[in-house]
Regions:
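Acidic/glycine-enriched connector segments
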Residues: 1-121
Length: 121
């Protein structure tokens, strides 16, 4: 899970609600940061209380900050079987990540698309 926008916060909250309702014995909520952000460094204890695991991408943290998020996003796609997103237009970093996921043969559910959400945008 990233932490770059409203959708990331909403998705994290949904995962925690489901874990609370059905139990957390078979799930975790992992935050993957592109580099140690100031927000994380200044609030490390609250982050550790909220997330099951916190990782910092080595490859992303070694890159220029503008490239770091895309590197981190691709790493998350590579580790995933299912990608859930909310992408309304075919431009920007989120779109590039979804495009990459589709190229990798991942199942993509786009919550912004009400009619056809699996592997379609």
């Amino acid at each position: 899970m990233g932490r770059s926008g409203d959708f990331d916060q909403y998705a994290s909250s949904a995962v925690l609600r489901v874990r609370k309702a059905v139990g957390d014995h078979n799930s975790s909520l992992t935050l993957v940061l592109p580099y140690p952000t100031a927000e994380y460094l200044n609030n490390q204890e609250s982050f550790e209380d909220y997330y099951s695991y916190i990782e910092v991408s080595d490859a992303a943290s070694a890159a220029h900050h503008k490239a770091a998020y895309q590197i981190r996003n691709r790493e998350m796609v590579d580790r995933s079987d299912l990608v859930v997103c909310y992408v309304e237009r075919e431009s920007g970093g989120a779109w590039q990540t979804v495009k990459y996921a589709l190229e990798q043969g991942k199942t993509v559910i786009n919550l912004a698309n009400e009619d056809e959400s699996v592997n379609l945008l």
